[in-house]
Amino acid sequence: MDSKYIRNFAIIAHIDHGKSTLSDRLLEMTGSLTAREMQAQVLDAMDLERERGITIKAHAVRMLYKAKDGETYQLNLIDTPGHVDFSYEVSRSLASCEGALLIVDASQGVEAQTLANAYLAINNGLEIIPVINKIDLPSADITRTQEMIEQAVGLDATDAIPVSAKTGVGVPDVLEAIVKRLPPPTGDPNAPLQALIFDSWFDAYRGVIVLARVMNGTLRKGMRIRLMSNGKVFDVESMGVLTPKPMEIGELSAGEVGFFVATIKTVSDTKIGDTVTEDARPAAEPLAGFEDIKSMVFAGIYTVDSHEHTLLRDALEKLRLNDSSFFFEPESSVALGFGFRCGFLGLLHMEIIQERLEREFDLDLITTAPGVRYKITMTDGSTLEVDNPSRWPDPSEIEQVEEPVIRATILTNEEYVGGILKLVEEKRGRQQNFEYVTPTRVMLTYELPLNEIVLDFYDRLKSVSRGYASLDYQLAGTWVSPMVKMDILVSGEPVDALSIIVHRDFAYERGRALVSKMRELIPRQQFEVAIQAAIGSKIIARETVAALRKNVIAKCYGGDISRKRKLLEKQKEGKKRMKRIGKVDIPQEAFLAVLKVGEDSASKN
């Protein structure tokens, strides 16, 4: 097909603003699916995607649309994840397009992720069509939403298209706007091949399936291709397009989007953002914008039943086949046995992996408190990167610690600003910007340590704002901070799985809260149990779980006091001996207490 009849576009929106529903309507109206094949959220194939109402993986669907001008156009919809953890995937998906539909909920207005993804689209030079969705809701306010789009995003919203993706009202106008307002792709089909990988997944029968947008040249079946980031060479076995059912074709030329299967065995070879070129006639340089995805959040994952350790390893390897952005390595803990240290893109990514392990592989898991990666400069001038408290060096050898920092954008209603400011200050935030987007809607920009975000920030932000605040963030460098490792000792023995890295100024209250929480959770023993929080050799907080005592003087009726004293002394000696040799079993809830401490201190405020 002539490239002037091709339109490549993405749909960008905040979670729950109706992106997947609009995609369904477009598929229905272009006749890509029969009524029988239609089901809600066609493109969200994973159960988790449907349940949480989020898109986790990118998808690409080809539709044929006969426009009012009588021509048939090929529309390639690239469905992108909306969540901040997957923003690199979004940026690569957007780089595959010439235009984007910016969907805004008419009742909620512009949210933080709408903004973040809209800026990504603008930076990629895309033509943006604003679409105001959910106009069938009684609380819909089209005029106010247009004003918000103009003020917050800086786009002209006078010709924004009002639609209801649920009922189908206004959707034909969206199709016409895609054809009329979005530019066709540019690219020379005869130039050396350059194709951008924007997603890949593993199929048990065919190996790795790669989604790509051909920028220049033509990709053909049987061609020997080379991946430009690692120089690996593969043969293309088959290729095609998703309509959304896979349909095999012989070639993809400049401007087209489709999938190909080559002799690739692992997803880690096909990095998102990489450039595919022909081995015999390679392109002079790769497409711009490729980055290696780095894990941001780290946690230990262990099985409740230590015999299931090998099952956990197999499950993680299977998940890694489909998700090269998360990594794991074996680690062992005295308290929890054998497990794995895992790295994730963010908190949602961690939750999704954990839920998939429990749901798809039927495993019972314990997850340790999530942490981040610190850069440590030692007194001898060398540097270390540490993401696990157990590898924290001796404090006397540390010169300085740098912690990762994020730039957070929070959009909220003005009545909740006070509570949010208090929360952000508590989390060591530094204000960058404060502006009114509309008379009642405020946009706050803060720099915050990632370490403070990973535990409970999002939940607390939602509770402070009664669910009306939305958050988006990206990495913004590092700060030098006095971070220390805090150990929890039970009966004088450090429990490695409970160690955490904290800011020195907050160590005392964090330690105090943690040991008092542990005191409630560790069952009473026959001997007293000391629970201590320590930084190095210095104890900063202590609680004691009192011993269970039998009433040894119950059998004494009257008589001399020395008889009773003798029995009590004898009991005390026995308890002392027990304490020396006794072992304390720490229940699973105690490990989860590390995660909950912040929430409890918040609910008391």
From Swiss-Prot:
Output the Gene Ontology terms for molecular function: GTP binding; GTPase activity; ribosome binding; translation elongation factor activity
Q: Can you state which reaction this protein catalyses?
A: GTP + H2O = GDP + phosphate + H(+)
The tr-type G domain covers which part of the protein?
A: 4-186
- InterPro entries in the record, alphabetically? EF-4, EFG_III/V, EFG_V-like, EFTu-like_2, LepA_C_sf, LepA_CTD, LepA_IV, P-loop_NTPase
Q: Which GO terms describe its cellular component?
A: plasma membrane
Q: Which Pfam families match?
A: EFG_C (PF00679), GTP_EFTU (PF00009), GTP_EFTU_D2 (PF03144), LepA_C (PF06421)
This protein's major location comes to membrane
- How does the UniProt record describe the way this protein sits in the membrane? Peripheral membrane protein
Q: Name one GO biological process term.
A: positive regulation of translation
Keywords from the named record: Cell inner membrane, Cell membrane, GTP-binding, Hydrolase, Membrane, Nucleotide-binding, Protein biosynthesis
- Task of the protein: Required for accurate and efficient protein synthesis under certain stress conditions. May act as a fidelity factor of the translation reaction, by catalyzing a one-codon backward translocation of tRNAs on improperly translocated ribosomes. Back-translocation proceeds from a post-translocation (POST) complex to a pre-translocation (PRE) complex, thus giving elongation factor G a second chance to translocate the tRNAs correctly. Binds to ribosomes in a GTP-dependent manner.
Q: Give the similarity note.
A: Belongs to the TRAFAC class translation factor GTPase superfamily. Classic translation factor GTPase family. LepA subfamily.
Q: Under what name is this protein listed?
A: Elongation factor 4
To which species is this protein native?
A: Acidobacterium capsulatum (strain ATCC 51196 / DSM 11244 / BCRC 80197 / JCM 7670 / NBRC 15755 / NCIMB 13165 / 161)
